[in-house]
Amino acid sequence: MATEHLPAERAQSPLSAPQRVEEPQKPNYALRLTLAGHSAAISSVKFSPNGEWLASSAADALIIIWGAYDGKCKKTLYGHSLEISDVAWSSDSSRLVSASDDKTLKLWDVRSGKCLKTLKGHSDFVFCCDFNPPSNLIVSGSFDESVKIWEVKTGKCLKTLSAHSDPISAVHFHCNGSLIVSGSYDGLCRIWDAASGQCLRTLADEGNPPVSFVKFSPNGKYILTATLDSTLKLWDYSRGRCLKTYTGHKNEKYCIFASFSVTGRKWVVSGSEDNMVYIWNLQTKEIVQRLQGHTDVVISAACHPTENIIASAALENDKTIKIWSSDY
């Protein structure tokens, strides 16, 4: 146990209250597990909302379900004919949706590993997907430049939004389900009313670099965007203002997933094209840790819902998932 040495004149008497130990200003993420199972570049990793599982998708057209704590392969989901770009969990952790270059989305029952429905309607690669919080709707984004909203129960497309003028890179539902955010290679980030399909706001940067990732913050007040000029930004979208900018990583080519870490202190986490995971202090914007170990571009970084655990995944010269954990 570390002892704090105080100058003599400030030493506490035995009767005074003990000093509060300050939480460390930086995390100490260390590698715990390396998961190998995919035979091609991994595209996405996501923890289940209940924290038990990790789903990964890859260019081998497979989804693998892993134990989040033991790293064991629990299930492999077969069905897509071409590479998968994204996967997302339902709120009760019982179902998954996947987005594929075969122009379809598939809805899966996790326990049985069976495909429940195939959602057809996009005319080009489906690149990104998400469930709304009640998990009765799915949103998808495609290289056909549209965003589609699907009904889970029937598998029908309820709405098609002519969202952007270039491929859609990311879609995400707000925590109350009322809004959808989309990002595109056209350099725009758009916020949509999920019920009406109306565009409520457009966020754009000077120079309009391609938007490679977007996500609402867990409290729903902010949006995190990534652009292909190696920049992450935190937006107060209700005012259309950029509040924070995070730099130091490399992101010029790939749509790399980023995440908010809120289980300990508040960090922003992202993969990088220099084969590392970057962690920033959300408030101060300083890089607090870089995680080394992958041997190719880290395409995806996901944070566990309740523990200080990060999963990262890399492209074809690596093909592994790494699980990292921190004491705080």
UniProtKB/Swiss-Prot annotation:
Intervals of motif DDB1-binding motif: 186-190
Keywords: Repeat, Ubl conjugation pathway, WD repeat
Keyword Transferase belongs to the record: no
GO CC terms in record: Set1C/COMPASS complex
Residue ranges, annotated region (Disordered): 1-23
Cystine crosslinks: none
Domain of life: Eukaryota
WD repeat spans: 37-76, 79-120, 122-162, 163-202, 206-247, 250-290, 293-328
Annotated Pfam families: Beta-prop_WDR5 (PF25175)
Recorded GO MF terms: histone binding
CDD domains to which the protein is assigned, alphabetical: WD40 (cd00200)
PROSITE patterns: WD_REPEATS_1, WD_REPEATS_2, WD_REPEATS_REGION
Keyword Repeat: yes
InterPro entries registered for this protein in UniProt: G-protein_beta_WD-40_rep, WD40/YVTN_repeat-like_dom_sf, WD40_repeat_CS, WD40_repeat_dom_sf, WD40_rpt
Protein family membership: Belongs to the WD repeat WDR5/wds family.
Subunit organization: Probable part of a cullin-RING E3 protein ligase complex containing CUL4B-DDB1 and a substrate-recruiting component (DCAF). Interacts with CUL4B and DDB1.
Entry function: May function as a substrate receptor for CUL4-DDB1 ubiquitin E3 ligase complex.
Protein name, entry field: WD repeat-containing protein 5B
Native organism: Rattus norvegicus (Rat)
